[in-house]
Amino acid sequence: MREIVHIQAGQCGNQIGSKFWEVISEEHGIDPSGVYQGKLSTQLERSYVYFNEASSGKYVPRAVLLDLEPGTMDSVRSGPYGSLFRPDNYVFGQSGAGNNWAKGHYTEGAELVDTVLDVIRKECEGCECIQGFQMTHSLGGGTGAGMGTLLISKYREEYPDRIMTTFSVMPSPKVSDTVVEPYNATLSIHQLVENTDETFCIDNEALYDISLRTLKLPNPTYGDLNHLVSATMSGVTTCLRFPGQLNADLRKLAVNMVPFPRLHFFMPGFAPLTSRGSQDYRMHSVSDLTQQLFDAKNMMTACDPRHGRYLTVAAVFRGKMSMKEVDEQMFSIQNKMSPYFVEWIPNNVKTAVCDIPPTGLEMSATFIGNSTAIQEIFKRISEQFTAMFRRKAFLHWYTGEGMDEMEFTEAESNMNDLVSEYQQYQEARSTDSDEYDNEEYYNQQEE
C-alpha cells in the first residue's frame, strides 16, 4: 500500500485542494457523502492511495485542511463535498496571517503547527506504508506560504525519507492580491528549494491567459482558474491513482524528473483545454494532444519553454489509445524540437498511458516539464523583491514578528543562485570531446 497524505494550507490551497478532491472523487465513483457509486473495478483498485475506507464503508480523503482564519474552512465545509472530509481534520486559528509570511512562519502559524502535526500523524498512522505528502498552497500570502513552508520543514525532520510534493501557486503581477507578494514568495522559495522533492509551479497569470485566449472567457473568475488547476492536478496524479505503466509513485516521478536536487520546479500543462461546464465538442487524436502539450500556450506557468531547454519531461496520456501511437508521436515531437532538449540527458522524455479518461473527455494528456525556462518566474519575483527591499519598504511588518533582515538577504541570494544554476545547465553542452557534434548542430541551426 502506497498512500499519500494531502495537506491544503491557506485560502488558495483550500480552494484548489477542495476542487481537486471533487474531481478525483468523481473519477473514482465516490459521491459527496463518501459512498462508492461507480461501476468499474479499476476505480477502487488503487483508491486507497488518497482515500481511507472507513468501517461504515464510506471513503474518506486522507486530507488535512488548515488555515489561520475560520472563513475558508466554513466555505469548504458548506460546499458540496464538505461532509466528505473527516471533521477532526479541519484545523484553523482565529487571527489570520494577514498576508504576512512572518506571522504564518514564526508567530501565529507556529502556535498552531503542533496541532496540525498531530492530525497529520494520526493520518499517517492509518496508512500501511506512506509514500509521501502533497501540499496545495500559494506562495504570495501568509498562511499557505509562511505556515505551509513551516510544516514542510517539520515533516522533513519527522519523515526524512518520504517524498514531499507541493502544488504551489506563484504570485503574478497581473493577478496580484497584495503588495508584499514578492517578499512572501521569495521567503517561501528559499524554503522550497531546500525542503521539497517536487514542486509544481502554477501561475495565476498563465491561467488567466489560458482562460482569456484559449477558452475565450471574457472575465475569468477564480472558479475558472481552479478548474484548470484541478484538471492538471488530476492528470499529474493519474499514475498514482489508477493502474498504469510508468511513474506509479511519487519517488519514481522524482527519480525520472529531477537531475539535480535543487532543480525540482516543474511546469505543468494540460490538453485539451476546456472551460468549466462545456464538454469538449471536438474529436482529438493523439497527435493533436501531443502538439498541444508542447505548446507554450498550454503551460500553467507564465514562462515560455522556448526561452530555455528541457532537462526532463513526463507526459501522461489518458483514454483509449494505442501505446505505439503515443510513443511514435512523442518520438517525432522530440526530433522536431531537439534543440529544446538538453542533449546530455539521453531518453529524457517519459510517457505513461492510463485507460481511464477524465470525466467528460474521451482522451486527455498532462505534461510535466523540468525546463530551465522556469527561471523567468524566479527572475520576475526577484526583481520585484529587490525593488522593495532596497528601500526596506514594508519590512517593519516582518521585523515586528521577530524576523531579521539577514533572512531576507539570504532568501534573495538563494533565489538568485537558483536562477544561475538553471542558466548554467541551459548553456551546458555535452563534454568537450563532442566538439565535432556541436559544430554540426550549430551548422544545422544556422542553415
From Swiss-Prot:
Cofactor(s) the protein needs: Mg(2+)
Q: Which GO terms describe its biological process?
A: microtubule-based process
Locate the residues binding Mg(2+): 69
Region ranges (Disordered): 424-447
Classify the main location: cytoplasm
Q: Where in the cell is it found?
A: Cytoplasm, Cytoskeleton
Binding of GTP occurs at 11, 69, 138, 142-144, 204, 226
Q: Which GO terms describe its molecular function?
A: GTP binding; GTPase activity; metal ion binding; structural constituent of cytoskeleton
The keyword Cytoplasm belongs to this UniProt entry's keyword annotation = yes
GO cellular component entries? cytoplasm; microtubule
Compositionally biased, Acidic residues: which spans? Answer: 433-447
Which terms are listed as keywords in the entry?
A: Cytoplasm, Cytoskeleton, GTP-binding, Magnesium, Metal-binding, Microtubule, Nucleotide-binding
Q: Which organs or tissues contain this protein?
A: Lens specific.
The record's family statement is: Belongs to the tubulin family.
How is the quaternary structure described? Dimer of alpha and beta chains. A typical microtubule is a hollow water-filled tube with an outer diameter of 25 nm and an inner diameter of 15 nM. Alpha-beta heterodimers associate head-to-tail to form protofilaments running lengthwise along the microtubule wall with the beta-tubulin subunit facing the microtubule plus end conferring a structural polarity. Microtubules usually have 13 protofilaments but different protofilament numbers can be found in some organisms and specialized cells.
Its function, per the record, reads: Tubulin is the major constituent of microtubules, a cylinder consisting of laterally associated linear protofilaments composed of alpha- and beta-tubulin heterodimers. Microtubules grow by the addition of GTP-tubulin dimers to the microtubule end, where a stabilizing cap forms. Below the cap, tubulin dimers are in GDP-bound state, owing to GTPase activity of alpha-tubulin.
The name under which this protein is listed is Tubulin beta chain
Q: Which organism is it from?
A: Enteroctopus dofleini (North Pacific giant octopus)
